[in-house]
């Protein structure tokens, strides 16, 4: 079973059982953000985590096994995204990416922000003009070294 097929089974069962990512996160013992990334095919689950999710979602054994395979990360299509929400992140990086890069370099020096030693938090922020999406990206700074 391919990772894409496993992901589709996860999404179908999640919808059918009317589960939230936070409920699935309880089964993995990780954050809802990490769990969503894992179950959408971007992270590897341990045998215990995959088993717990498999029981919760009634996944077949080959799907549970598939959740434990190291995925090809960043395997989304390379074309400009067409989904409106994902496109806004693409647009955000196009507009603010160079500013973010400059500000990180000014503060930390020449290097990158890790997406491996990384955490993310997504929450709702009440606002009288309409609720806001709050996203915190927290990655370790990794300086380039000279050799």
From Swiss-Prot:
**How is this protein named in the record?**
Cyanate hydratase
Return the EC number: 4.2.1.104
Q: Which GO terms describe its molecular function?
A: cyanate hydratase activity; DNA binding
| Keywords of this entry | Lyase
Query: What residues make up the catalytic site?
Result: 88, 91, 114
One Pfam family of this chain: CYNS_N
**InterPro entries from the entry?**
Cyanase, Cyanate_lyase_C, Cyanate_lyase_C_sf, CYNS_N, Lambda_DNA-bd_dom_sf
Query: What GO terms in the biological process aspect are recorded for it?
Result: cyanate metabolic process
Q: What does this protein do?
A: Catalyzes the reaction of cyanate with bicarbonate to produce ammonia and carbon dioxide.
Which reactions fall under this protein's catalytic activity?
A: cyanate + hydrogencarbonate + 3 H(+) = NH4(+) + 2 CO2
Q: Which NCBIfam families match?
A: cynS, PRK02866.1
> Can you tell me which family this protein belongs to?
Belongs to the cyanase family.
Q: What class of enzyme is it?
A: lyase
């Amino acid at each position: 079973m391919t990772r894409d097929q496993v992901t589709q089974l996860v999404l179908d069962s999640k919808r059918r059982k009317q589960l939230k990512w936070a409920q699935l996160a309880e089964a993995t013992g990780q954050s809802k953000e990490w769990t969503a990334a894992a179950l959408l095919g971007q992270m590897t689950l341990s045998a215990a985590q995959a088993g717990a999710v498999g029981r919760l979602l009634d996944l077949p054994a080959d799907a549970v096994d598939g959740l434990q395979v190291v995925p090809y990360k960043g395997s989304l299509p390379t074309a400009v995204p067409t989904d409106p929400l994902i496109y806004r992140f693409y647009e955000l990086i196009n507009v603010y990416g160079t500013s973010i890069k400059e500000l990180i370099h000014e503060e930390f020096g020449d290097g990158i922000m890790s997406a491996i030693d990384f955490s993310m938090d997504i929450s709702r922020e009440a606002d009288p003009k309409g609720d806001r999406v709050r996203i915190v990206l927290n990655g370790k700074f990794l300086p380039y070294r000279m050799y």
